Amino acid sequence: MTRWVPTKREEKYGVAFYNYDARGADELSLQIGDTVHILETYEGWYRGYTLRKKSKKGIFPASYIHLKEAIVEGKGQHETVIPGDLPLIQEVTTTLREWSTIWRQLYVQDNREMFRSVRHMIYDLIEWRSQILSGTLPQDELKELKKKVTAKIDYGNRILDLDLVVRDEDGNILDPELTSTISLFRAHEIASKQVEERLQEEKSQKQNIDINRQAKFAATPSLALFVNLKNVVCKIGEDAEVLMSLYDPVESKFISENYLVRWSSSGLPKDIDRLHNLRAVFTDLGSKDLKREKISFVCQIVRVGRMELRDNNTRKLTSGLRRPFGVAVMDVTDIINGKVDDEDKQHFIPFQPVAGENDFLQTVINKVIAAKEVNHKGQGLWVTLKLLPGDIHQIRKEFPHLVDRTTAVARKTGFPEIIMPGDVRNDIYVTLVQGDFDKGSKTTAKNVEVTVSVYDEDGKRLEHVIFPGAGDEAISEYKSVIYYQVKQPRWFETVKVAIPIEDVNRSHLRFTFRHRSSQDSKDKSEKIFALAFVKLMRYDGTTLRDGEHDLIVYKAEAKKLEDAATYLSLPSTKAELEEKGHSATGKSMQSLGSCTISKDSFQISTLVCSTKLTQNVDLLGLLKWRSNTSLLQQNLRQLMKVDGGEVVKFLQDTLDALFNIMMENSESETFDTLVFDALVFIIGLIADRKFQHFNPVLETYIKKHFSATLAYTKLTKVLKNYVDGAEKPGVNEQLYKAMKALESIFKFIVRSRILFNQLYENKGEADFVESLLQLFRSINDMMSSMSDQTVRVKGAALKYLPTIVNDVKLVFDPKELSKMFTEFILNVPMGLLTIQKLYCLIEIVHSDLFTQHDCREILLPMMTDQLKYHLERQEDLEACCQLLSHILEVLYRKDVGPTQRHVQIIMEKLLRTVNRTVISMGRDSELIGNFVACMTAILRQMEDYHYAHLIKTFGKMRTDVVDFLMETFIMFKNLIGKNVYPFDWVIMNMVQNKVFLRAINQYADMLNKKFLDQANFELQLWNNYFHLAVAFLTQESLQLENFSSAKRAKILNKYGDMRRQIGFEIRDMWYNLGQHKIKFIPEMVGPILEMTLIPETELRKATIPIFFDMMQCEFHSTRSFQMFENEIITKLDHEVEGGRGDEQYKVLFDKILLEHCRKHKYLAKTGETFVKLVVRLMERLLDYRTIMHDENKENRMSCTVNVLNFYKEIEREEMYIRYLYKLCDLHKECDNYTEAAYTLLLHAKLLKWSEDVCVAHLTQRDGYQATTQGQLKEQLYQEIIHYFDKGKMWEEAIALGKELAEQYENEMFDYEQLSELLKKQAQFYENIVKVIRPKPDYFAVGYYGQGFPTFLRGKVFIYRGKEYERREDFEARLLTQFPNAEKMKTTSPPGDDIKNSPGQYIQCFTVKPKLDLPPKFHRPVSEQIVSFYRVNEVQRFEYSRPIRKGEKNPDNEFANMWIERTIYTTAYKLPGILRWFEVKSVFMVEISPLENAIETMQLTNDKINSMVQQHLDDPSLPINPLSMLLNGIVDPAVMGGFANYEKAFFTDRYLQEHPEAHEKIEKLKDLIAWQIPFLAEGIRIHGDKVTEALRPFHERMEACFKQLKEKVEKEYGVRIMPSSLDDRRGSRPRSMVRSFTMPSSSRPLSVASVSSLSSDSTPSRPGSDGFALEPLLPKKMHSRSQDKLDKDDLEKEKKDKKKEKRNSKHQEIFEKEFKPTDISLQQSEAVILSETISPLRPQRPKSQVMNVIGSERRFSVSPSSPSSQQTPPPVTPRAKLSFSMQSSLELNGMTGADVADVPPPLPLKGSVADYGNLMENQDLLGSPTPPPPPPHQRHLPPPLPSKTPPPPPPKTTRKQASVDSGIVQ
């Protein structure tokens, strides 16, 4: 039988290369790239887990896995796999996984810019990873790529706020276990700086500037300009030379060699192979060139061909002449300065031709530079340019794609700023400047051509030594440009002459002049007419001086001048001629020998760039000193004046000469000082930046070429003499220079002694040692001098003396040297040269001396004393810190011998000093990080032995130990609470934590040993310990649950969970306290609570029992645990709000403490009560925290109220007030000013009008400046009144104002404030009467299902809607808050299935507030006053729906239409401190049909009454609502008369069946009768205000009213209104408000409402109030259900309405006056509602009116109703009204009296109607919801191991694969 078998080593690790979806519980889902640890295998299946989620094991197909090499460690359960990849590959892989997760989040958050950045970085890393894995890269490229990879990772981590990775120089991640603390700190600093620079670069690139680039170029000693010539667009017609060079327009001179390209007449390069490879690099540019005001790139084009282009007869014409053609100039200053960099950009340089034949190219160049633009006519050059850092060797290495061996190199004319030792040159730059040539026998000036060549003294021409430009071959003679018939040509043409060094002294330059004719025949006959020359070597052996030379032009007579011997003896320049006593200015021709000097003149300039030839005679004299020893002293002195460049060129020769002079005069001391000074001068030169690269040459000379065995004695002696005479003025300066050269001098001394020992076997050792000792003593004596003259020399000695250590110890005892240095430092006077002294010590630490144990024994005590002295005085902290860092770093090394004793020295002398320095240092100090690193390093390097020894160092002074521990605890706590290192320095922070943890535990042992017994107990010390330990445990960087799983695993693996370690230590320390525990209660409750709240289960279990221990302690002491209880409640609030605590903690707290309490004899009952109290508080606080950051502020308000009510219940006033203000702030954020006011009022009620002092917790806000309760209460009242005013709750504001006014008037006597207050009150009264206040709707909302938080679950709330908020809007808002909730379709209470389901169900419908008028208003009062109480100060709400009882009456449905009314009572009145309150009681009543009719009639009368009153009060009101209201009642076509009531209730049969209803029937008749006078008044007002357009409408209404009035008065009697409504406007007649209002005892509980016809029947509905209803018969009942309306009927009804509308002519007239939105047609089951526009709500467009026809519970009447046939044709829309039931407004919304308000119209708002109010256990009508899709049918599981696994799907494209794996492309 086969079975699962463990995998072999090579099968342990693999990567999924395709997605796999688990198809069973035992399987493991895989994503592409998942790495798996494979444990077992079985027939094509593997079992294991992914490394990203190790807890989930499962099986998966082997065919989906690519196996990889891995290192397997451990066995069985402890087996782990470590990938066998390169560390860098592993890092890239981990990084990619981490970034990809964040990448997805960025996509979800729609952070596009960052998403793209991360995508580019991910793609780069994937590509580079592939390159590294390919193994094909050469080592240097691999190294470069590694740098790029690590830089990219570090940059990406920073921008994604991930941890900083620290690396060594090779880019490998540092292991903190193997790295010293100081090195780790420095690595973090470097990494952070590099990433910061990289960020700046990215930022600069976005701004198109590259500051770093400019800085980089400025810091580079050598630069080069790369030029790529793309094309020359120029119509030349002949061959040409294109000469490119750099030019300084300010100095008008060329600064580089030419780059020469020969161009053919066909428009292509002559060398066709270089067609696309015309590249050159202009090298040797330096900082001086960057400082030039301007640099131009100049291109000169020289035509090579005929004299004149226009000549056509080419056969007879001279060819091959170099003629000026034109120039092209471009300013490259910005490119050279690094401001512009784009190697791909092609620059067009416009071409400027020469204007005439006598236009010199130099002149044209200057003209073009001066001109603003060039008329180039499309002619010019195309080039690309790029500035490159480095010399030619670096450039070739770093930019091989630009510069290769074929690239022409054009050097700067002259030496670069930094002369490289290997740069051997012997170049002479010759420039043809100008000439002046007599025309001689010719009629016009000559066409002069100058030919340059090089000859030796034998007259032999040197071949191929002239270079016309880079990129061209060497030539033997150079011919100048010819200017046509110009007497004084100016050429400015430069060529380079490169002659072998051995030929220079024999060579001379020869210039011949010839007239060139345009005719070939004439030209051949033209001979050389003159000659000039100049020798390259002067008579004194030096080379030709740089600069201009005015050459003598000799006439070319026959063949005389062909013989060099003939003219070489003659002077070559005018200067030489003058030296020989001849006149150089005489116009007459002079004859010298056989040669005649011409009148012509000719100037050249030269520049020698040679590392082998010198122009300095003094240097030459020194090098050849033996030839004239009498001048030796002079030559040695003159050497100090020679240009440095000349000296370094001949460095080895010069040094040889100096030491030869010294050795050959060994007996004499004559030249010793001079040679020493010369040596110091040369060493000083090499220290100069310009010649710093010669330092290796000097080093090599000392090691390999130096051979003066006795030099050490003389050098030592001279140096000592200088030191001894340090205070002499002349000596001081030279000694200073010698000190700067000390390192090299000692190298010479040591090397000399070693050479001597090799020859003479240590002969004279004692003398040598003694001479050195004498020298050091002299230096030490000098250091103790107080003279001001020696300060500079002493500073130099401190700086340069340490540099000799590593050399001197080769020939001198290191211990003696250490003693010398100790004395050297101690001799420096305190207070002088402190910083130099400290840096000197740093250099000593860096030297080999400090790595030797015995030397350290001597040096370290001195160093620690110095550090202690300066640290205590806060002097030069940076240098102190550096010194201590370097010492600690050396002591960390394993190769420096024993260090335990030295760590002890540092601990004893410096630990406390460093601690105090850290404590005194501000967090903003740049050095704080360094000092903390030093302190951490000391602690880390201390062993247990050191800690034990530390206490002994304090001796018997117990207070010292206490102080030390106090300082340390406070410092640790500060460092933990406010870390000095950035959050992303994770490794540094973890190392620090590890060190601190060990130190804290070590110090805890000291506490237990020394400060626990009764006599020595230190309360504050223990207190500080506990606070520190808790701060350590709760610090952010240790909260592992906040980190990614990978980071958590790394930390646990490296450091473990330090929280547990210290948590258990805290527990033990607490129990160790014994009898002292009571001293820590209640102070330690908070810290211990913080600790127990850490989400680590074992830690919680171990530490929660401490609370019981605290309860016991306090109980034993005081017989209660009140202090503990108060403290834990207060602190728990802060902690939970701060994010700590969870459900598990609540359970553990409950369980553990209850267990302990129940076992205790006395605490069983009180303890249990306390635990339950805390658990209840925790529940509320956790609820509060859960939604504290929720967008849903209403939930936040609910939870806040729950918490504050709890605090009120347990009488925690401080906490209660705290939450009141949280609630108030939330209300203000939502503009709930009314609720904010009620909330503040709760605080005000806690205060008295007294002078009692205000305790701190009462003044919760900084804004309140109050010392007494009375003052605070006054301020609160002012604020509350302000909020009530903003919330339009003027009645409440007035009530408070009266109370405040009483105080101002009778207690405070503050009449000024009283005056202000009364003015406000007056305004409030006016507002009540005049300002329209929108009536809010109220909604009942039930939350069912276990998915809701506890504070909502299973509860019903009444919500107060916002202004103008309809039910649909409210529901939408509600469902936005709970997007997963399902809206219930019925208004019936839900069953247990819904209540217990895991989901969320919301039930929402409109309810109507029940008016509860204050007794004072039970008399005639203005509707404006009463209307406030209809929707405010309400606690009871009703919801009504019609039900049928008895037999169905087809003639009159109202006879058996009952109303079922549900009354909801809330916990508090609305509005209150919330916009909603929980329903506390629900009961139901039934309203009979008759009572319903009475209510409806009463409301109709009230409505007419109210509107009439409004028009009397304000004649400017629009007439439209009144028109519709009146017409709806009086027009029999609309309402059908009173037939419905009469048929239903006014019959003998009804009275027989309901004998008790007699009184009510009379009441109904009375109400009908009273309607007539109201209508009469309304019609009178209407008649007064009606427009002419509507006059027919009014007349018809009057006719209808007349009929109605006659009928009513006949049957029900006449009612008469009081005299004049106008006269009674101030106090309304009783008949207007109360006469039709039934006594409360006889009235039904509330007004029934068919509102339930639509749960949205809210006042916000258009046309939902302002009319009455008439009882009519139902149109049709559906056979299947009374609750369903046939769709066909709906459609038919709509069509009928449209038809009626079309048929009515009056309707058209009506609509002209009334806008289309003024009338909305609604139909209901029992009535067809024709509603006038509600003045209460803004008018909405028809599209927003609910399609009430869709509801089946409607009362409708057939259009062919009998009553409508008996009346005149209607002028109003055929929407019917009924008196028997109210409009949807009246049922569950507002009463008819609400018509008082005429708010502004609201914006359009589309919505879908939803009429759930009437439905009884039936679906609400509205937009149909499609049935949910069938549950997803899962595929059958794949075959398990008994069968082979499914094959992987076929390979897809990368994009598909990415999509499959969930990666966003």
Curated annotation (Swiss-Prot):
Region span, Phosphoinositide-binding: 1687-1695
Polar residues biased stretches: 1855-1865
Region annotation (Interaction with NCK2 second and third SH3 domain (minor)) ranges: 1793-1819
Domain (DOCKER) ranges: 1207-1617
Feature: compositional bias, Basic and acidic residues: 1680-1694, 1705-1716
GO CC entries: cytoplasm; cytosol; glutamatergic synapse; guanyl-nucleotide exchange factor complex; plasma membrane; postsynapse
Compositional bias annotation for Low complexity: 1639-1666, 1756-1766
Every SH3 domain range: 9-70
Location of the motif SH3-binding: 1799-1805, 1838-1843
Compartments reported by the entry: Cytoplasm; Membrane
Compositional bias of kind Pro residues: 1824-1851
Top-rank taxon, per record: Eukaryota
Region annotation (Interaction with NCK2 (minor)) ranges: 1837-1852
UniProt note on tissues of expression: Highly expressed in placenta, lung, kidney, pancreas and ovary. Expressed at intermediate level in thymus, testes and colon.
Domain C2 DOCK-type: 425-609
Biased composition (Basic residues): 1695-1704
Region (Disordered): 1619-1716, 1732-1865
Keyword Membrane: yes
GO biological process: apoptotic process; cell migration; integrin-mediated signaling pathway; myoblast fusion; phagocytosis, engulfment; positive regulation of epithelial cell migration; positive regulation of substrate adhesion-dependent cell spreading; regulation of postsynapse assembly
Residue(s) carrying Phosphoserine: S1681, S1743, S1751, S1756, S1761, S1764, S1858
Assembly, per entry: Interacts with the SH3 domains of CRK and NCK2 via multiple sites. Interacts with nucleotide-free RAC1 via its DOCKER domain. Interacts with ELMO1, ELMO2 and probably ELMO3 via its SH3 domain. Interacts with ADGRB1. Identified in a complex with AUTS2 and ELMO2.
Domain remark text: The DOCKER domain is necessary and sufficient for the GEF activity.
Reported function: Involved in cytoskeletal rearrangements required for phagocytosis of apoptotic cells and cell motility. Along with DOCK1, mediates CRK/CRKL regulation of epithelial and endothelial cell spreading and migration on type IV collagen. Functions as a guanine nucleotide exchange factor (GEF), which activates Rac Rho small GTPases by exchanging bound GDP for free GTP. Its GEF activity may be enhanced by ELMO1.
Name of the protein described by the UniProt record: Dedicator of cytokinesis protein 1
Organism placement in taxonomy: Eukaryota, Metazoa, Chordata, Craniata, Vertebrata
Gene: DOCK1
